[in-house]
Swiss-Prot record:
ATP binds at G13, T14, S15, L16, D17, G18, V19, D20. This is Anhydro-N-acetylmuramic acid kinase. Keywords: ATP-binding, Carbohydrate metabolism, Kinase, Nucleotide-binding, Transferase. Pathway: Amino-sugar metabolism; 1,6-anhydro-N-acetylmuramate degradation; Cell wall biogenesis; peptidoglycan recycling. It comes from Hahella chejuensis (strain KCTC 2396). GO terms for molecular function: ATP binding; kinase activity; phosphotransferase activity, alcohol group as acceptor. The keyword Aminoacyl-tRNA synthetase does not apply.
Amino acid sequence: MKDREIFAGLMSGTSLDGVDTALASFQGELPETIATSFTPFPSDLKYKLHHLAVADSWRPDELFAAESQLTLLYAEAINDLLQSADIDRSRIHAIGCHGQTIRHRPAINWPYTCQLGNPSLLAEKTGITVIADFRRRDIAAGGEGAPLAPAFHMHVLQHRFPNCAVVNIGGIANITQWSEKANAVVGFDCGPGNILMDAWCSQAFQQNCDHGGQIARTGSINHALLQEMKKEPFFSLSAPKSTGRELFNHDWLQANLQKTASVDDRDILATLTELTAQTICEALNTNTLTHLFVCGGGAHNLFLMERLSRHLPGILVKGTDSAGIDPDFMEAMAFAWLAMRTLARLPGNIPAVTRAQGERILGAIYPA
């Protein structure tokens, strides 16, 4: 333990379920996961963050109060994990904090992205150097600012799986794919991951998600609704591209439901699951693909995993745990790794993925 450089990663995504925290070392050929934890959002914070992500406007006090509450939860997650793992904070070189995205608009005339999280407060409450604000440098360089995890996906998997794709199914689904023949990598958001399924579960079944895909499995795919949703222009955009809750949200779902004859609640959920599966599979280049590794909450949706396998005959579809990375903490590990890259003054983006003008060192450093 004393010889290892340990980095922490904090990730809270568009699913708004809570904070994933990982402690990791990257000195070996494969990353070493030292400890992990999940800290759920209290209901009031979840409500505030959802409101900030979808509302057309809000008061500054709402924004900054929510940011402070969120940051204190981040600090609590770090401090509690260090205590439970019996690791002294002096051993942690830095925390890579993604923050909570409330807006991501890289394609407008004045492009921007906004992640809540006060790195100064986090450094103060943990006594650990914090690396934050990873996305804006890539946007400043003409990129999408997302996805950033592909560099980490390649780092941990490419040498073992030369013709492979990774899909992170959080609120939004994003793909990383590389092939030995093309000697190139692509990465992009391909559409909704769990975000619409979770929204419908909350509205129709009063639960936060479809555990294991058990409800969707009892429904039938409504092809009229599916085709209506697939008319969304985002799906036909060429990569690189990125999206978020500002597009795929409850209002988007309701607008599509209104264009379709009445559909049973379970059939709607089955159709939303199929939408995620089809838009992922249609975004992949299957010519040389041998493996699809799934991370994020979607890896636990067995019905969704079956639908992915159904659309990808001859391709092995597995959770990233089969490759040695816990699917629940892949993204937190990625931001711990990006923090390491920043401290080492190494680039963290892949221009072919984000469309940036070149490689850039990402993030800002907030010393302990």
